[in-house]
Design a protein with these regions (language model features):
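Conserved N-terminal beta1-alpha1 strand-loop-helix module at the mouth
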Residues: 1-154, 158-203
Length: 203
């Protein structure tokens, strides 16, 4: 599957998803370690999944945990990248000891705030993940500019029908694909994900 933008599959909660990611050449697998999230995965389960798969970079997605807790868990699991959605100050991030992706919620941030946030964290982060349920056409200019200046993972609204257009218009560094839940252990359908991948790779 060929596309200039990389792909991230998240949240990984089972071995089936991890194997799918590896088989399809997906660059990043996200594991949710935010205890307040419905997608929270026990670290011991994540460790089992990570040990059985290879080929994709592992991304630990954290919530409001303390910096030291994040650093210790990311080291214990040998995570490749840490994704943060909390308010840890930029100059504290090197203490984590891993490449950092800063998650930004556009639902609560206007264009000026977004520009300031990107500028403040850029020296300490390898990239940013933009989250939210915004109407992207209303913020097209700032999103194009952000994707041009920074490594942006697109976790904003898209559908199979328009994903190719989004990649062409905004040119994000990567796009986040949503991993669903297993119907039962070891059994899962991937029709929707395959449809998105086919749309991305279509001429």
């Amino acid at each position: 599957m060929a596309t200039s933008s990389k792909l991230k599959l998240s949240p990984i909660t089972n071995l089936s998803d991890a194997r799918f990611a590896a088989a399809e050449g997906i660059a990043y697998m996200g594991f949710c370690f935010d205890p307040s999230s419905a997608d929270f995965l026990l670290p011991i389960k994540a460790k089992e999944i990570i040990e059985w798969t290879s080929g994709s970079h592992t991304v630990g997605e954290f919530g409001d945990q303390e910096l030291q807790d994040i650093a210790e868990l990311s080291e214990l699991l040998n995570l490749d990248i840490v994704l943060l959605s909390n308010a840890i100050l930029p100059d504290e991030l090197p203490q984590i000891g891993k490449p950092i992706i800063k998650a930004i919620n556009l639902n609560v941030m206007d264009s000026v705030q977004l520009a300031n946030e990107l500028c403040a964290y850029a020296p300490y982060c390898d990239g940013f993940q933009l989250n939210g349920t915004i109407e992207i056409s209303e913020r097209e200019g700032e999103l194009i500019e952000a994707c041009a200046q920074y490594k942006i993972i697109w976790n904003l609204p898209f559908a199979t029908e328009n994903v190719k257009q989004i990649l062409h218009t905004y040119k994000p560094y990567a796009i986040n694909l949503l991993a669903g839940s297993e119907e039962k252990t070891g059994m899962k359908e991937y029709d929707e994900l395959y449809a998105v991948l086919d749309a991305i790779s279509a001429n």
